[in-house]
A protein has these predicted regions:
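Cytoplasmic helix-loop-helix junction between adjacent transmembrane helices
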Residues: 112-149
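Helix-loop-helix hairpin linking two adjacent transmembrane segments in secondary transporters
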Residues: 147-190
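Interfacial helix-cap and linker-helix signal at transmembrane-aqueous boundaries
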Residues: 44-45, 76-77, 161-167, 261-262, ...
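Helix-breaking motifs and short loop linkers at transmembrane-helix boundaries and internal kinks
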Residues: 49, 81, 102-108, 136, ...
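C-terminal transmembrane helical hairpin of 12-TM major facilitator-type secondary transporters
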Residues: 283, 288-291, 298-353
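Cytosolic juxtamembrane N-terminal segment immediately preceding the first transmembrane helix
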Residues: 1-32
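Extracytoplasmic gate region of multi-pass secondary transporters
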Residues: 38, 231-291
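Conserved MFS/SLC helix-loop-helix module at the cytosolic interface between two early adjacent transmembrane helices
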Residues: 68-106, 303
């Protein structure tokens, strides 16, 4: 029998609900801080004298840093625990969002956005790992889908805040609001339990370290390259490439949609203005991204993980070119919501299938590498789309994003089916 989000929460224990809320808040506020840059980009470009290529390059730096941060925080989460690593990542991106508002030069802004990216990358794998290890097998897909859906809420909240703040103040104050997520760490520290699976694994590892060296197991001391060896090697490469092409398509498209909608027509945009753009983005998130993220967990429990990936990614590849050709506000609204549904919904599967492929001793670092490593590789997407858009227009550049989603759907066919698998 299918269950909805409310029934899902009723079936969970209080500790499971708190871990879900912590991961969802972290991911929502990650989106909030990350997307503030896109929402004020047109104003930052004007005041700091940035070209589209330079603006895209700053996005590239942030995504590159997120890959580094994902790997770093993955190792950190395996060493000091999921909860503390989650707290550190949230503090990192919150403080640097505030600092971005103090920037007076492009170089200053680049430094702060780079450090913000480190925290942004670390939050995803630590939160996903915490939920995967806390929730039971039969509810795991739906729980992670709920976490992923919070990105859409964060993006919509960022659009709302930017739309309101920019009416009364400049873009710097939009970044200043980005410090607020730091307050969430106070609650996480007191109210969220550590993953019992990680605690048990650490206790086992400590017991092994008390035994003679000849009898000592290798858990906890395995090389990073274990994820490239049998039986994980093929899955690691396939998941890395799926995430790379998917993230290339997503960041290439959604990092440029806000300026694309708000810039005047003569500058290659749609000329909807800041309030029109904010309204379109809120609708896009609440009626496209949010149900897309949320639905994937339920679809994956019916079709399986692999088929669901192929469905969502292939649909995104079809609808992105149609969105790029849209001219009227109504067409932009409807097609934008459809693209957001499929083009972001598949992300709910990345943490899910990765958690089911890898054992506890490798899980956080493997998720950190396959997702945030891919995010680092895809860091060129905003720069490439900005560069192509400067010469040929952003509409034409968006076709590249559709091609990236298609390649991601092909990579999904190489993944193992993990539906119903118990975590090791």
């Amino acid at each position: 029998m299918a269950i909805g989000p409310i029934q899902l929460l009723k079936q969970a224990t209080p500790a499971q609900r708190r871990t879900l809320l912590a991961a969802a808040l972290g991911w929502m506020l990650d989106a909030f801080d990350a997307m503030l840059y896109a929402l004020v980009l047109a104003y930052v470009m004007r005041d700091l004298g940035m070209s589209k290529k330079t603006a895209g390059f700053l996005y590239t730096l942030t995504l590159l840093a997120s890959g580094i941060g994902g790997v770093f925080f993955g190792f950190l989460a395996d060493r000091i625990g999921r909860k503390r690593a989650l707290m550190f990542s949230i503090l990192t991106y919150s403080v640097c969002s505030f600092a971005s508002g103090l920037s007076t030069t492009v170089l200053m802004l680049a430094v702060f956005r780079f450090i913000l990216g480190l925290g942004m990358g670390g939050e995803w794998n630590t939160g996903a790992t915490l939920v995967a290890e806390t929730w039971p097998d039969e509810l795991r897909a739906k729980a992670i889908a709920v976490v992923q859906s919070s990105w859409a809420i964060g993006y919509a909240l960022a659009a709302l805040v930017a739309g309101v703040v920019l009416r009364y103040a400049n873009w710097r104050f939009v970044f200043f609001v980005g410090i607020l997520p730091a307050l969430v760490t106070l609650w996480i520290r007191k109210g969220v339990p550590e993953s019992e699976m990680w605690v048990d694994h650490r206790r086992t590892r400590q017991d092994q370290e008390l035994e003679p060296r000849v009898a000592r197991g290798t858990q906890g001391n395995e090389s990073f390259f274990t994820i490239f060896r049998a039986p994980y090697g093929k899955s690691t490469v396939a998941l890395l490439l799926l995430n790379f092409f998917g993230l290339f398509g997503w960041w290439g498209l959604f990092s440029w949609i806000p300026p694309y909608l708000s810039l005047p027509v003569e500058r290659g945009g749609r000329g909807f203005g800041i309030m029109g753009t904010a309204t379109l983005l809120i609708v896009l998130n609440l009626f496209g991204m949010f149900p897309g993220y949320l639905s994937f967990g339920w679809v994956a429990d019916h079709l399986g993980r692999r088929k669901s990936f192929v469905l969502y990614l292939f649909a995104a590849a079809v609808f992105v070119p149609l969105y790029a050709m849209a001219r009227s506000q109504a067409a932009v609204l409807v097609l934008g919501a459809v693209v957001a549904f499929f083009g972001t919904g598949f992300f709910s599967g990345s943490g899910l299938i990765g958690s089911e492929i890898y054992p506890t001793r490798l899980r956080a670092r493997a998720l950190g590498f396959t997702y945030n490593g891919a995010r680092a590789l895809s860091c060129v997407a905003p720069w490439i789309i900005g560069w192509v858009g400067q010469g040929k227009g952003l509409s034409w550049a968006f076709y590249l994003c559709g091609g990236a989603f298609f390649l991601a759907s092909m990579m999904a066919t190489q993944l193992p089916e993990t539906k119903g698998k118990r975590l090791e």
